[in-house]
Amino acid sequence: MAKKVANIVKLQIPAGAATPAPPVGPALGQAGINIMGFTKEFNARTADQKGMLIPVVITVYEDRSFDFITKTPPAAVLLKKAAGVEHGSGEPNTNKVASVTKDQVKEIAETKMQDLNAADVEAAMRMIEGTARSMGFTVED
């Protein structure tokens, strides 16, 4: 028989750097999860992606067991890394802070494809380009 789901917790945690300190500890503690067990497993699973922000969906069951799914880093994080900037523009319509190439956008779209609601890579590229424009980046051919 399937376990009954008690709670679903969504967090964004730096890869390989989950600690029991806030915000991870309190969120997991409220859900009744073994915090050290989660942090060790998460850090082991994401050790190869150090420095990236990883979204994670934790499913907590009534018997206090859990499992989790890691997703691909947010498009904004991947775009900032590709452009080599710290953060996007506060005024994206008037102040452009960086530029990314179509090749970089395609690479990001292929990375994010499993998490995007897109039929093909072209549609995913359009989504990533929209994110880039809203961050004050220009997309060059």
Curated annotation (Swiss-Prot):
> Where is coiled-coil annotated?
none
* InterPro entries the UniProt entry points to: Ribosomal_uL11, Ribosomal_uL11_bac-typ, Ribosomal_uL11_C, Ribosomal_uL11_C_sf, Ribosomal_uL11_CS, Ribosomal_uL11_N, Ribosomal_uL11_N_sf
What CDD domains does the record point to?
Ribosomal_L11
Keywords assigned by UniProt? Methylation, Ribonucleoprotein, Ribosomal protein, RNA-binding, rRNA-binding
Q: Cite the PROSITE patterns for this sequence.
A: RIBOSOMAL_L11 (PS00359)
The entry's cellular-component GO terms read:
cytosolic large ribosomal subunit
Superkingdom of origin: Bacteria
- What does the UniProt PTM comment say about this protein? One or more lysine residues are methylated.
Instruction: Provide the GO MF annotations for this entry.
Output: large ribosomal subunit rRNA binding; structural constituent of ribosome
Q: Which Pfam families match?
A: Ribosomal_L11, Ribosomal_L11_N
Q: Name one GO biological process term.
A: translation
Q: How does it assemble?
A: Part of the ribosomal stalk of the 50S ribosomal subunit. Interacts with L10 and the large rRNA to form the base of the stalk. L10 forms an elongated spine to which L12 dimers bind in a sequential fashion forming a multimeric L10(L12)X complex.
The UniProt entry's sequence similarity note says: Belongs to the universal ribosomal protein uL11 family.
The job of this chain, per UniProt, is described as: Forms part of the ribosomal stalk which helps the ribosome interact with GTP-bound translation factors.
What name goes with this protein?
A: Large ribosomal subunit protein uL11
* Native species: Limosilactobacillus reuteri (strain DSM 20016) (Lactobacillus reuteri)
Upper taxonomic lineage? Bacteria, Bacillati, Bacillota, Bacilli, Lactobacillales
Gene designation per UniProt: rplK
